[in-house]
């Protein structure tokens, strides 16, 4: 399938199956997506191949997705952010981001592939607020 967009997407989740599945859904829909299980690896790669969109789990053991998003914005200011989580503790992390001027929206997880694609396509059209998917 040929790419329908030049959008470079990084998908980060500490669970390989989730990162790979989301990247596959995006690739099957014509997007260029790279899966990572290590947020530090995603940051290193971003220095070489600046992503247009970061899709990341919020709750990861070595670095939260919110911290990853904030660091990604420092490395790649034009990168848009899409976060997801199944953890209630997400609210505390979001508060930190809001205090730094980022206004995240909260949606329920699991996200249906159609919903994921709608959000990604929406990110193609807007440079504003990041999205958080949570349970």
Roles of regions detected by a PLM:
Residues 35-53:
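Acidic, metal-coordinating helix/loop segments flanking the phosphotransfer/catalytic sites
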